[in-house]
Design a protein with these regions (language model features):
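A bilobed periplasmic-binding-protein/Venus flytrap-type ligand-binding module shared by bacterial periplasmic
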Residues: 3-9, 104-115
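Structured helix-beta-strand junction loops
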Residues: 13, 23-25, 70-71, 88, ...
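Flexible hinge/capping segments at coil-to-helix
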Residues: 1-27
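Generic preference for hydrophobic
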Residues: 2-3, 27, 93, 107, ...
Length: 144
């Protein structure tokens, strides 16, 4: 999901298209190597030259959110994070147009994994924190 400052041109849009991202005044991205950053760069089909000219790289999503709230640019946040925002922050959230980027969590172990029961408990705990509607890909969603 896009987190867009009121001063950015994208704030007036109801949904964000990948082509719109390049029109933003400032794009705040996590440092290279963060999987969320890499997935969003791939999804928006940004080249490394674009990210170096357009984006500011730091290590904290919270810092980016404060920058956006103070009127500076756009960043991306996971949908689960958007659910935890207060009303004034939710006003800054813009969903992506179809296709919607979606992330998938997969647990893979060796067939003889000794802590299989522990892994099953972990999976149940993760699922308890994620709305059931997010457990499967929906129409218009694409894995990033």
């Amino acid at each position: 999901m896009g987190y867009v400052s009121r001063e950015d041109a994208l704030f007036k849009k109801e949904v964000i298209r990948t082509a719109d991202v390049a029109q933003s005044s400032q794009l705040w991205l996590l440092d290279e190597g963060h999987c969320f950053r890499d997935q969003m760069v791939r999804f928006c089909q940004m080249k490394s030259s674009q990210t170096s000219q357009l984006a500011y790289n730091l290590g904290s999503m919270e810092t980016f959110m404060r920058m956006v709230e103070s009127g500076m640019g756009i960043t991306f946040i996971p949908e689960l994070a958007a659910m935890q925002l207060c009303d004034s922050q939710k006003e800054l959230v813009r969903p992506f147009a179809i296709p919607v980027p979606t992330r998938q969590l997969i647990m893979i172990t060796n067939r003889n994994f000794i802590r299989q029961a522990l892994l099953e408990v972990l999976v149940k705990e993760i699922q308890a924190g994620v709305p059931k509607a997010m457990w499967k890909l929906g129409a218009g969603q694409v894995l990033v």
